[in-house]
Amino acid sequence: MKRTFAFALTIFLCLGFLFGFGSKEELPTAIDPANPSPQDEDFLFSQRIVSLVPSVTETLFAIDAQDMIVARTDFCTWPPEVAAIPSVGGFDGKTISLERILSFKPDLVCLAEVMHNHLIQPLEDLGIEVFVSNAESVQHIQDEILMLGSFTGKMDDTMLLLDTISWQLEQARIQATEKATAESPDTVYWEVAAAPYFTPGKDSFITDLLAVIGLENIFAQVPQAYPQVSEESIIAGQPQVIFFPDYNHQGQQAVQTIARRAGWQTLPAVINGKIFPVDSDLFSRPGPRIGEMALQLVDLIYGLPPQLEGAP
């Protein structure tokens, strides 16, 4: 039995920037995302999982399947308990060898399309199941979580997690709607990297996450997950909010650096002080904390403490 799954995940931090640029190639899909439960009568739940994807590792912990993880990467750092699991190396495919993966005798290997595409066929040729993570929207993240729950037999925990995520997303949407006024910002430039400039595009979960809380990525119609854009196009977009991953934990110093860029003083985001650093690890991982991300963005925009009463 063979199952290869492709959704859409692009992690944009790798040795500082784990992200893949460019268009995606289609990979075969053995299970319909709308009906992710395996139907094969000889199906067995995964018992030995090597996870090369930080968001997948987080998900496995979140659905109480962490005991099935036999190996991870150096960049699988959340939750903290993951440190006790052996590592196969860095996130970059060049630092991970097939031999190292096989040494853990996995029955399922979870990998990222952009970084690990070269591992898919060799693993399948050896009869090892492969899960290709590729989440380009909030719904795809939830679909992926559901599939991981079905592979591991942890459906009760998975459904509880999905209920929590759905509630968090709805709370974020409600809070944003209630606080929004005619003067509230609604266009966003999300900076992944500068000089050259990279930003989430049409195929990024970040673009979809912003839409959930009523914000529009000024590059939402640009193909690819993380396209390179010109500084001129950023200025022309006149974003009312700027978000950026605070890789080096510079906080307000990094905010001032952005605000002082030549020609950026005309941007509404700069004029109104709407430049916000975000957690670079959290916002690079389309996984079980997607609802938390939405609530944090609402808090940044509207200055609200997260309202969590009544959480499932």
PLM features per residue range, with description:
Residues 53, 113-114, 195, 222, ...:
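Short secondary-structure boundary segments
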Residues 93, 97-114, 128, 230-247:
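Proline-aspartate-enriched helix->loop->beta-strand connector
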